[in-house]
Amino acid sequence: MAVLEVCCYSVACAREAERCGADRIELCAAPQEGGLTPSYGVLVSAREAITLPVHPIVRPRGGDFCYTEEEFAAMLNDIRMVRDLGFPGLVTGVLDADGQVDIPRMKKIMAAAGPLAVTFHRAFDLCADPRQAWKTLGTLGVKRILTSGQQSSAEKGISLITELIAAGDTPIIMAGAGVRAANLPLFLQAGVKEVHSSAGHWLPSEMRFRHPGVSMSADPDADEYRRYAVNGAAVAEMKRIISAWRS
C-alpha cells in the first residue's frame, strides 16, 4: 500500500494528520516560504505528541538551494539537533551554483544525519539534470526524493516521475506538489509508492481586534489574519483511496 506523507506546519496539524490516517509527517515552519526548519520548541513538542514517524525539514531560508558557508553551517547544526532529539528522518537538499547536487555538502549532510533516513526535497525540481541527480543521490545513500517531476505540479510532471520510478527502487520517488484526493488515482496507477500532500486549507485568525494598515510582513498585501492547517477530512479521503486501491 502506498505511503501517505502529510506536510504539517504545527504540532496541532501533525496530530490531526495522524488521527486521520497519515503514515508519516513532514514537519515545517513558514508555509509562505515553502517550508523552513521548525523551532527547537516545536521539534520537542512533536517528539512528545506524535507517534507517527516525523521528518523535520532542514532549510534555513526561502528561495534557492545554494547556500552560504554560514547558512550551511547552521544546517549541519540543525541536522545534529534533529538527530539528537531522536527523529527517524529529515528532509533537506543543497545544490551548487550550476544546478547540480552539491556532492561535497551532501556528504557532510549524510555524515551529520548518521542513521536517519534522508529525503532530498524539491531542490531536485530545480536541478539541471534530474536523471543524473537521481543516480548521484542514490550513490550518496539518500532514502527518497520528493519531486513534482520538475513541473509546477506533480500531475504535470507525471512523465518524469514515472520514468524515475522505472529506473530503480533507490532512491524512492515520492510524488508531491498538488497531490490531492481528486488526482491521487493517477499516481497510484503510475506505480508511485509514496505520495506527499499538504492536504490543507487556510483558517481565519482568532483575533477579534485587527489593527488596519500595520503589517509584520515585507509583503504589504499579505493576509496575516489567517493560518494554514491540515484538513483532516482531506487526509482521511486520501487514505481511503489508497486503502481501497490496495484491494
Curated annotation (Swiss-Prot):
Reply yes or no: does the keyword Cytoplasm apply: yes
CC terms in the record's Gene Ontology section: cytoplasm
Question: Keywords assigned by UniProt?
Answer: Cytoplasm
- The cysteines joined by S-S bonds are none
Q: Main site of residence?
A: cytoplasm
UniProt keyword annotation of S-adenosyl-L-methionine present: no
Indicate where this protein resides in the cell: Cytoplasm
Give any GO molecular function from the UniProt entry: copper ion binding
List the Pfam families: CutC
Homology family: Belongs to the CutC family.
Q: Which NCBIfam families does the entry mention?
A: PRK11572.1 (NF008603)
What HAMAP family does the database record attribute to this sequence? CutC (MF_00795)
- This protein's name: PF03932 family protein CutC
Name its species: Klebsiella pneumoniae subsp. pneumoniae (strain ATCC 700721 / MGH 78578)
Q: Which gene specifies this protein's sequence? A: cutC
